[in-house]
């Protein structure tokens, strides 16, 4: 197929427990700076990491993502890992996506802190044939890797989902850290309350 007719789609994977403005800003900046057709936020079913963390149901995480991105036409959702179930390995996901969408070039967005772990990723050499890695540079990060990585400069917000869950557990509303409609959903559904 003619390279000019190919779609350029970014993927930002994560637990999104909950989604917040740092995730959204990263996805939107990559979409604009790389001139992508869309960036899809891709919630993982079960993270493959050793430090498995407790997460809320996929239903709630997907609903929060839908609320967070509904006003931005550059962002969308990719639910393949939720639908597939089991552990979420990037290689398995990208193999399925590239087979299902042969006219699409995928750009996998990672934080600069993940670049040093690329050698440990499952089937990294095969994954590199399927995707282009995009990393957002932090001031304190050395921008080099033995793997091909496209580095972008974008402001990064020091917000973490862990911090937000702790705030909700203490009954502190994290106004301005995540979209208000997501805060309202979390409060209505009583998510992240101490048991």
Swiss-Prot record:
Gene3D superfamilies: HUPs. InterPro entries: Cyt_trans-like (IPR004821), NadD/NMNAT (IPR005248), Rossmann-like_a/b/a_fold (IPR014729). It holds the Pfam family CTP_transf_like. One of its GO terms (molecular function) is nicotinate-nucleotide adenylyltransferase activity. GO terms for biological process: NAD biosynthetic process. It catalyses: nicotinate beta-D-ribonucleotide + ATP + H(+) = deamido-NAD(+) + diphosphate. Keywords: ATP-binding, NAD, Nucleotide-binding, Nucleotidyltransferase, Pyridine nucleotide biosynthesis, Transferase. CDD domains: NMNAT. Its EC number is 2.7.7.18. Pathway: Cofactor biosynthesis; NAD(+) biosynthesis; deamido-NAD(+) from nicotinate D-ribonucleotide: step 1/1. Signal peptide: none annotated. Belongs to the NadD family. Catalyzes the reversible adenylation of nicotinate mononucleotide (NaMN) to nicotinic acid adenine dinucleotide (NaAD). This is Probable nicotinate-nucleotide adenylyltransferase. It comes from Lactococcus lactis subsp. lactis (strain IL1403). The lineage of its organism: Bacteria, Bacillati, Bacillota, Bacilli, Lactobacillales. The gene is nadD.
């Amino acid at each position: 197929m003619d390279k000019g007719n190919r779609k350029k789609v970014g993927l930002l994977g994560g637990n999104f427990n909950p989604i917040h403005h740092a995730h959204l800003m990263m996805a939107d900046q990559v979409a604009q700076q790389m001139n992508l057709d869309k960036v899809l936020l891709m919630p993982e079913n079960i993270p493959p990491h050793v430090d498995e963390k407790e997460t809320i149901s996929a239903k709630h995480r997907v609903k929060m993502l839908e609320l967070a991105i509904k006003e931005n036409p550059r962002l969308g959702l990719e639910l393949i890992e939720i639908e597939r179930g089991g552990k979420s390995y990037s290689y398995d996901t990208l193999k399925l996506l590239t087979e299902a969408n042969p006219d699409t070039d995928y750009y996998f967005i990672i934080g600069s802190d993940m670049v040093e772990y690329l050698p440990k990723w499952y089937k990294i050499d095969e994954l590199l044939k399927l995707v282009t890695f995009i990393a957002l540079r932090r001031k304190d990060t050395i921008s080099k890797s033995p793997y091909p990585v496209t580095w972008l400069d974008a402001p990064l917000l020091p917000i973490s989902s862990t911090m937000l869950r702790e705030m909700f557990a203490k009954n502190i509303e994290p106004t301005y850290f995540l979209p208000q409609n997501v805060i309202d959903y979390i409060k209505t559904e009583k998510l992240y309350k101490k048991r």
